[in-house]
A protein has these predicted regions:
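Hydrophobic alpha-helical packing residues
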Residues: 44, 112, 144, 184-191
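Terminal RNA-binding accessory module
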Residues: 167-212
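Generic alpha-helical structural signal
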Residues: 38, 106, 110, 138, ...
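Glycine-rich, charged/polar anion/phosphate-binding loops
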Residues: 40, 67-70, 138-142, 190-193
Length: 212
């Protein structure tokens, strides 16, 4: 399992050092050959004894055409992608400063579906972010159903001292957050059941982690 706080940042430090060296020497900047997380997957693909590779968590901005071109032939890579979402509403995403839109997120999912046979998606969602209206919450509810997640981790927003969100206006009442959380949890369970039902009768290579 490839894991880290920000998987998409792998290789950024290599590129930073290459730029510094180019500036210091006056040479033309050349970033070819500098590895990223896609190169790590390909390297592990060629290691005897490693039969299954999984990426623990993926930032949507990590799913680039270059990354997909590298990993699409990696048959040891488990086609499960935990794509960080937080909200399916663009106005909430903007307040969160997430750096992507719901349309861009869906585009990443569609590109992964084009590269892999029956990939599964899981995600995290926060309900009750400051200022979240009922209409904005409904957008998130509709969006998660469009993506059709296999599973979701759902959290109620809780302010942390010193963060911008903690001092935002229109903090959401605890009861409202509880209700919205329950609605998303129910929707997530329904999606899980439908995803599992689609697998009935199919043969798949699986990894058994514990005795059933």
């Amino acid at each position: 399992v490839l894991t880290g706080i920000n998987m998409s940042s792998y290789g950024v430090d290599f590129k930073r050092e290459a730029r510094k060296e180019a500036i210091a020497t006056g040479d033309k900047e050349d970033l070819t050959g500098i590895p990223d997380i896609g190169d790590v997957v390909i390297a592990l693909q060629g290691v005897d004894g490693i039969e299954r590779i999984r990426i623990s968590s993926v930032d949507p901005q990590m799913i680039t055409d270059e990354f997909l071109e590298k990993i699409k032939g990696a048959d040891k890579l488990c086609p499960h992608f935990h794509l960080s979402m937080q909200s399916g509403c663009d106005t909430v995403l903007k307040r969160m400063n997430r750096g992507y839109s719901s349309e861009e997120y869906m585009d990443k999912c569609n590109k992964l579906r084009a590269c892999f046979d029956n990939p599964s998606f899981t995600t995290d969602a926060i309900v009750g972010f400051p200022g979240e209206t009922q209409e904005e919450f409904d957008e998130t509810l509709n969006f998660i159903r469009q993506v059709d997640f296999l599973d979701m981790h759902i959290f109620q927003f809780s302010p942390r001292n010193g963060t911008p969100a903690a001092s935002m206006e229109k903090q959401i009442e605890p009861r409202v957050k509880q209700v919205r959380s329950a609605i998303l949890i129910r929707a997530a369970k329904e999606m899980t059941e439908k995803n599992l039902e689609r697998m009935v009768g199919k043969k798949e290579k699986v990894l058994v982690e514990e005795k059933v």
